[in-house]
From Swiss-Prot:
Glycans are attached at residues 296, 518. The keyword Glycoprotein applies. Residues 1-53 form the signal peptide. It comes from the Eukaryota. GO terms for cellular component: endoplasmic reticulum; membrane. This is Uncharacterized protein SPBC1E8.03c. Keywords: Endoplasmic reticulum, Glycoprotein, Signal. The keyword Endoplasmic reticulum applies. It comes from Schizosaccharomyces pombe (strain 972 / ATCC 24843). It is found in: Endoplasmic reticulum.
Amino acid sequence: MVVIANKGALWAYYCKRLLNSVTYMMYPLIRKRTMKKLLLIVGLLLACSTVMRRIPLFHESFHLPSLDPRASTTTSQKFQEYRSDFLEKLETAEPPEDVIMFTAYGLGVHTHNLFMLACDMAKTSDSQIRFLLLTDGTILPEALYDYNRETVSTCPLSFLSYSTGVERLSKELILKDLLSLQFQQALLAISPSVIVTSEHSPLVMFQAINPYLNNNYYTHDTVDTNALEENSWITKLDMQSLQHFRTPRINVVLIVEDGTYKYLLNLMRDLGRDFKNSEEYPHLFIHLFMSENIPNLSSIRANWPQHRLFINLHFNQKDLNLIEVWTPPNDYTYALVVDLQPDSPPQLSSNLITWLKYKILLIYYHKSSSTYKNNIAAIVPSFDFSNEEAVILSQTINSNIVLFAPVVFQKFQEYMAVRLLNPNFELPESNGIEFAHEDSVLGHSKPSLTEFHAILGLYSLVISYNHFEGSLSNELRLDNLIAYFLKNPSVINFEEISEKNLYFTYDSKRLSFQGAKNESKKLYNSVTSCPYYGSLSSFPIRSIFCEPLM
């Protein structure tokens, strides 16, 4: 006798016996082997179906339990409708107030570091600084003070908390909706212009607040709080600079010749060393001036994201003009033009890019520089430690590394387009000026750049590192200098600079800011006063701005 304990196995046993019986009966009609296989398959399927129906996992009414500890309820659905209504009202809401709100979730290291940055900003900022701590209901926001006792006593910022009722709601709402509700209450209460968060905040926090930030009604800036000292310069920005915090973009233009090609690969590695993903890399435009031999570019292409790398080869062409190597795509993209020289290859790094962005924000977006920024054509980082002043205004660019402002560079391109049609045009007293690196692209363009500066009253801001505290040597790495200035940021005082006779004009005169403006105005009038019938130009040169007389 066969004893079978499992019901499923019993079904299979009877099905097999049934199969044998049917096969025996139908043997005269068909081949036994084929029919046996067919009926065996049918029997096994019937047996498996019966067994699986007895397992709960395969019931039609069975559902896997949610992995979220808080179940979504009808209360959460009502909240979703409330949030949608709030987002629609933002389209007709009042303008944001002069408030900067730092926002964090939990009591991790990122919250502590963000709190430190907020306190530092509150000590010097003219705007109101608020700190919002989002909570899941298990930790009271006041605990943040316990973790920062030493800082709180000297911290003038206002603390925001919406913990009332959070403990009750935490049982009804999923965590994302709970954080979203607290964030929404803060926006209703103060309507900040700028919201600052740590880029290392938990993902659930960004999921909660992003619906309010994606419509661009509020400016949202993220800070790398793991590098607290390196990002302390952010606390020195004013409201206007913070609102444009994400605006500056820097493209890097490398001009490379036969003798400097050997530096290119290491230069690219240094520049891209600290970028975490391909979207952080700047667009890189490489212009290779080769005599005859074509270099192997595989290693060059392998060290930079392909969608951000542009390589142009130039053979036996030494007179390429600066306007041919780059074109600003918009008014927010700056060009860092680096003309590699065999005797002094520059040092490039992500720190330098960050430092230049900081200077862009201070110069082109800072409230104190609003009356001067339109006259700034470029920023020139100076590695000459012999400079007596930290900042110099100059109409002559004697450097092989220059950051050009996009709007002014567009004007320079328009100027050169007309200028090249008038090769005999010249400015008085501008001849005979000696420029370094005449054979390079920047050197070839310097006379035209100086001419352009002088006519329109523009200047370049030459920023030196000579006020570095402590011992200083030419061997000190650029990254060390940049790191120091990011940890000890200083705001450029344009009013103080403009009062000094540091303005170098095209003919090497040292004038005050106002004196140089008057000189440029006189020069501009001289070249734009076009002759007409019965009259002569006020200056004995033909203006490139004039229509030819018929």
